[in-house]
Amino acid sequence: MIHVKDHKQYDMFNPFEHLGPKRLALLESSWAHLFREEILHKLPAEKLFHLYDEFKGRKTKELYAMLGLVIIQQMEDCTDQDAIDNFALNIKWQYALNITETSDVASYVSPRTLWNMRDIVARQGLQDTIFENVTAALSKLCTLDPSKQRLDSVHIFSNMAHLGRIRLFVRTIRTFLTNLKRHHGKDYDNLGEMVLRYDKKSDGAFAVKPTESAKKLVELGDDCFYLVERFKEHEAITRMDSYKHLVRLFAEQCIVEKGENNTSKVAIKASKDISSDSLQNPSDPGAGYCGHKGKGYQMQVMETYSKDKTQPNLITHIKVEPANQSDANALIPAIEDAQSKELAPTELLADTLYGSDSNIEQAKELGVTVIAPVEIAMASSLVFQSRDSVFPGALCALSVQRVLRKPDPS
């Protein structure tokens, strides 16, 4: 049964009055007061209503407080157990979440409840709505000037094992076989000796010397191809995510060649031919690969800035994407997203990759001036034909030359 409070309605008596004026003053000058007064009631608890019955069953935990708990845990960088302890015992957290009752029902949350709520937020895609609501509330509260902003990306390492090609094949095939055994036991049993090869007890068979890795990869490619072909007509199995990962792995890592007597022969692609958006780990199929930063994701972040140090900076745009995505493709979507929130800049600082000619022209059409360094190769190719002539890009070239010039030893 749905349980929510109206957090915009004040209590007749202050439930925290017992703390005394000095401790109350500390609370009211902390982040907890800002969260309680400006953010808590803006959280999208109504988007959870369809998951619960309005009248039947046991009451849920207070849904605004649960969403707030998920946010504050990330904000304070707490472990699950620390978050649970703070929810139950920390006055500042209880004040921020407007927990005014002292019963275990109101002031305690189990690990499973916290896990489920975090999973719901991710599966329902509520993070975008939460960000938009909080950003709108803070921008109005702080009356910030969004005209000057900066954009950059930060790499995020996924919480997954970094697998070489052999381990990637083994992990993907083993994951498929595990799910096949769980849901289609007869089909699993009919595979015979293959299932024994991919038992965890047989891991030593895949620890090969570097000189033997090419041969082992071909064997793994053959097994992958065999499983893909064997079950491609089985509708229920082809709907399994682990089977889709198997198909994706084979398409990205292998090619099928025609052998003797018109038979199919599996060949392994060269490493240089593997796309950066290929499967990195079946446990996290959305992760990508960046040759500069590694495996995982990257986050595009755009925020306001001001020469006035008393003005806070506000993040106006966030987008998480696979690590293989280029920064060059992120500029225009970031500007358009900020415009949809009425927080668009007029001047935007960005790194070199964002500052392509195409991006600068498109941004100009959107009313935004992009300031970005010129690539070194481009700067070095600019040649002045005379001291009096100035052509497009000259000023940028001069600024780059000033940046690149070595400091005078004197």
Residue ranges and their predicted role:
Residues 58, 85-88, 107-347, 352, ...:
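Polybasic low-complexity intrinsically disordered regions
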Residues 28-68:
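Basic, short loop/linker segments at the boundary and entry of helix-turn-helix/winged-helix-like folds
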Residues 67-77:
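Alpha-helical support elements that line or immediately flank enzyme active sites
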Residues 392-402:
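Short, low-complexity, charge-dense intrinsically disordered segments
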Residues 387, 402-405:
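Basic polycationic patches enriched in arginine
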Residues 1-39:
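Charged, often Cys/His-bearing segments associated with DNA-binding zinc-finger transcription factors
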Residues 361-390, 410:
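Helix-centered, glycine/charged polyanion-binding patches within enzymatic domains
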Residues 92-113:
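Short, positively charged loop/turn segments that connect secondary-structure elements
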